[in-house]
Amino acid sequence: MVMNHSSGKSYTLNALPLSYSHQNITITGFNLTGLNYERECGDIFKYPKATERDVILFSYGHTRKWKHNKKDMRFAFSLVRKVLPKVTLVMLTMGDVPQDFIQLMTEFNVTMVPSPKQYLKGWNCVNARIPLSLEYLKQHQSDIDRVAWSDTRDVFYFNDIFATIGMNDLVWMSECVSPTDCFRHSTTGQKLHFYWMWWFYGRDEAFKLTQYNTPTLNGGFGIGGVSRMIQLLTKLNQEMDPKFTFQWGYDQTLLNYLYYKGELIDVGLDVDRCTQRMCFANKLNIVGNGKSTTFSMKGSSCAPVLLHKGLPSRLMEMTITYR
């Protein structure tokens, strides 16, 4: 039995996996059919299904890229709202946002929470979401069971990610695909992380981390019980250096630095190294084309529950509905 200490609610681990078979998503002019969650592909769903007490936290600061990103964001919110209709969606905003952004949030029943004025100067939105998310969760802790920390336009939900997580869990997504080469300055895909670490924590620290065979965490997705998430965000907030809060990449570098240093052990942070539950930019096995297409994880017959990036662009160009 898993206890939610904030609400007194108990969660019982399911003796058998929840009943899932295949997921069909009908897209205008395109069908995504037969996503496989049968038998062993359904074993990942061990916990209660998502309810309105489960929250996905997003953040947004307006940029000139809004018109370009609007289509992607519409697709992502269409998907999450169809897959998780009961979940509470919360958007933490920084500064003024355009009217069509507000309309999009209203369309998908997303609660908008404006940030205090103190975050309008000296803060990048991705860094500000650490203290903003912490404050929101502390204020509403008694109303929340589980919480997902999610990027806004390129995290794709194909099934109930909350049913894979217990109240005492805290799981973060790894960005590296290969567990043997996750933080190498000579590896093109990870070079940015190396130089971020150099910039924020020094050359010696960056080179030291190239010797570790541990994953590079991605700042775009994590999920867990609300108490665990509050513990993590409290630690991140305490360790933030004010002179870097305006710089892109600092939030993720801070997360990785604390993880490598072993300072998140007490928080109980686990890392998902690209499994069926979640994966960053996984290369999918795509079967079919035209009006009938399905996909699974590379090297598996099982469909992913959640992807961060990695979804074929031709699917994102369509309007999504369920059948």
Q: What are the residue ranges of the model-derived segments?
A:
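N-terminal anchoring/stem segment of glycosyltransferases
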Residues: 1-128, 132-144, 227
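Short His-Asn-centered micro-motif
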Residues: 58-61, 91-95, 150-152, 173-175, ...
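Conserved beta-strand elements of beta-rich interaction domains across eukaryotes
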Residues: 63, 96, 154-155, 162-163, ...
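A short acidic (Asp/Glu
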Residues: 100-103, 157-162, 233-234, 256-257
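A short acidic, often aromatic-flanked loop/helix-cap motif at beta-alpha or helix-coil junctions
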Residues: 118-125, 179-180, 274-280, 314
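GT-A fold catalytic core of metal-dependent nucleotide-sugar glycosyltransferases
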Residues: 130-186
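PAPS-dependent sulfotransferase catalytic domain
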Residues: 172-221, 252
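Catalytic core and acceptor-binding pocket of nucleotide-sugar-dependent glycosyltransferases
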Residues: 202-322
